[in-house]
Amino acid sequence: MNNATFNYTNVNPISHIRGSAIITICVSFTVILTVFGYIAKIFINKKNCTNNVIGLRERIKCSGCEPFCNKRDDISSPRAGVDIPSFILPGLNLSESTPN
C-alpha cells in the first residue's frame, strides 16, 4: 500500500529551473512595464493636466496633477473616486444623485 508516495528522482532539474526562470522573467517584465507606465503617466499628466477625452468631464489644472483634484465648479471638496464615461452607463447619473 505504498502507491500514494511520489518518486521525484525522474524530475529533470534543468526543465524545472527553466520554467521557474521563465515565470520570474514574465513577472519581472510585467512589474517593470507597470512602473514605467505609471512614471510615464505622471510626466504626461504634468504636461497636460486636463483630460480632454470625449465623453468625460474636463478637469481643472492642478498643481502637480495630484490624483484628488477638485471639480471645475466645486472647489470645496477634493475629488474622490473614478470617472465613469457616459457611454458605459447611459442611464445612470452618479454625480447628481442624493440619498432619500
Curated annotation (Swiss-Prot):
Q: Where in the cell is it found?
A: Virion membrane
> Does Transmembrane helix count among this protein's keywords?
yes
Q: Which residues lie on this side of the membrane: Virion surface?
A: 1-18
* Entry's transmembrane regions: 19-40
Where, in residue ranges, is this chain on the Intravirion side?
A: 41-100
User: Pfam families of this UniProt entry?
Assistant: NB
Gene Ontology cellular-component terms for this entry are: host cell membrane; membrane; virion membrane
The family annotation for this protein states: Belongs to the influenza viruses type B glycoprotein NB family.
Q: What is this protein called?
A: Glycoprotein NB
Q: Which organism is it from?
A: Influenza B virus (strain B/Hong Kong/8/1973)
Higher taxonomy: Viruses, Riboviria, Orthornavirae, Negarnaviricota, Polyploviricotina
